Amino acid sequence: MKTLYIGNYKDRTGWGYASLNNILALHSAGVDVVPRAITFNNSHKDIHPIITELEQKSEKDCDACIYHTLPPLYSYNSKLKNIGFFVTETVTFTETMWQKHINMMDEVWVPNEQMIDACHKSGVRVPVKIAPHSLDISKYTNIEDCADATEFAGCFNFCFVGELINRKNIEGLLRAFHTEFHPSEPVNLMLKINRSGLSTDSTLQAFKNLSESVKSGLKIRTKYKNEIAIAGHLEDRHLLSLMSKCQCFVMPSFGEAWCIPALESMAIGIPVIYTGNTGMDDFCHGWKVESEAKPCYSATDSLDYMYTSHTKWMEPSIEHLASAMRVAYETYKNDRKKYDLICANAQSKAQNYSNRKVGRQLKELLHG
């Protein structure tokens, strides 16, 4: 089935990487896929050589079109099978009116079980099918040791990779880390952060302000351990090198449709601490943090009609997050055999999301 794939696969964002890997997954499964790029920012990465080749194909005589974009940008073509592909990180999305655009499609694909429930609660009437995201798993073996991380030596290193926005709940992560671990313990918190519209220096300053505010609010000691904060663009090989020197990935977000850095960590062999009752339930392996549905508040995402307090996201328990971080560290320190098994199981689970395996699933969905 010749398939037109519209997505922002050239953007250097999690959404862009998801679109890119889904195209590569379809191609690996033998689908005649024709990619066409749209963009939502000015941060573009080098084009994958396979994508460059696929872009030369004609859109003529396509049998299906996958719209991997915001539902308001969907356009129905009666000559094709029309498939919407979207994500959301909230319990419902009724207030966005996305369901009206989604219901124009023949079917919609989402990456996790939680989103199926959100679709049904939000008035989606067309078939909803799970289409997981994927990775080029070969990138995560024999990782080059090219990152200078002398601070990591002899320590248990927690890793966070994500945007410096409220939805990612970095404030909660800082509260949990500094409440649970004394500065004398050999434990680090490394954060690779970015913030759209801010320079590297401004991003680091914004993080410093947040960190100081958290420490001031905790009032439990006069001196705290410094976090290891890194901002700005890193080449993939440098970021993966940094991540490979860590022992546990942490994502305490209020909502995640997927979380590519978590899956990347698992592919390296690093377990994950993650917010439960989110899209991460579908694939993460490690320690699940209890959460409760709460009205969204102070979201900094770019669309003002999303993440309002008329809908809810999942707020993780800071106490349970701190406890999970302690368990991860103590398991590593006192029961290395158990820790190594958790790592091995995380890495094994990540193999289920290779481009090749997911490509076969997507091909079946296309023909379903």
Task: Locate predicted features.
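Short hydrophobic beta-strand element within catalytic cores of glycosyltransferases
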Residues: 271-274, 288
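A short, well-ordered alpha-helix in the C-terminal region of glycosyltransferases
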Residues: 320, 327, 337-352
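Conserved donor-binding/catalytic core segment of Leloir-type glycosyltransferases
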Residues: 4, 150-168, 174-177, 189-191
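Acidic donor-binding loop of glycosyltransferase active sites
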Residues: 241-257, 267-271
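Nucleotide-activated donor-binding/catalytic signature segment of Leloir-type glycosyltransferases, i.e.
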Residues: 200-240
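Extended catalytic core of nucleotide-activated donor transferases of GT-like folds
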Residues: 4-6, 37-122, 238
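N-terminal pre-catalytic "stem/leader" segment of glycosyltransferase-like enzymes
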Residues: 1-64, 188, 356-360
